[in-house]
Amino acid sequence: MSPRTAAGVDPTVPAPVVELVGLAAYTELAEFGLLAARSVDAPDLATRQALADGADRALARQRALFALVSADDGVVPGVVGAAVMEPFDDVLADFDARTRTDAWAEGLLKGVVGHGVAQDFCRIVAGGLDGSRGRAVRKVLERPAPGPEAGADAGADAEAIWLLARMAAADEVLASRLALWGRRVVGEALGMVTVLLGRRPELVVLGAEAAARLGADLPAGRETEGAVRSWLVARLTGEHTRRMDRMRLAA
């Protein structure tokens, strides 16, 4: 059964919107899990609370995404969410397997970098959505710059970025180790994006639309997928570099 025809999903919502909402909501769920886990064994109470706040914000953003595709028919929201996320249930499995770590700071950076790439992908590809629903999706996915007092609209990883920046500034050895780890993680994350595009042709179409609206001149026909992939990887790499800069880590 297609997520678009599942119980509780508004049948008037275009299929590309349901597709992207499902992926974006799944990345928020993954971000929640990572931040909540890191909160449990955080080094101090303030850090524990900051990461818990970020985890809570991930679920709030996920609920906002579900609301964009939900029909007002009494179906439990969690059922709707599971239906639209189901096609992406294993999308992070290989990435997680390749980036296992027991180190607390490296685990936190894995979420910031890896899940950050996935969330950037959703935000960029959302540029290919038409109409008012497309604008609504983009509004949910847009994120203000992180800081020590991230607002309610900031990304779930805002506190994590700020915490890692403080840790890197205080310990040059740790900063070097995290920079090296970040390079490995982003490589795996970009590989994940490539696999995802190969599995979900709808996302390639959205990526092509987003690129065209930003003035990119991509070839048509059989070369489109490769061109879209290259364009997206370049954009995602730029976003990753800026994210690492905010953490005072070399990309």
Each model region followed by its residue ranges:
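A contiguous pocket-lining binding segment that forms or flanks enzyme active sites
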Residues: 125-194
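Acidic/His metal-coordination segments adjacent to aromatic residues that form catalytic metal sites
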Residues: 2-22, 86-111
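C-terminal accessory extensions/subdomains outside the catalytic/core fold
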Residues: 193-251
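Internal, conserved structured core segments that host functional sites
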Residues: 89-155
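Helix-loop segments that flank and shape redox-cofactor active sites
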Residues: 31-52, 115-132
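Alpha-helical scaffold segments that form or flank carboxylate-/histidine-based iron centers
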Residues: 16-21, 45-60, 107, 132-149, ...
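Conserved alpha-helical segments that form or flank metal/cofactor-binding pockets of metalloenzymes
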Residues: 55-88
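N-terminal capping/interface segment
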Residues: 1-29, 41-46, 67-78
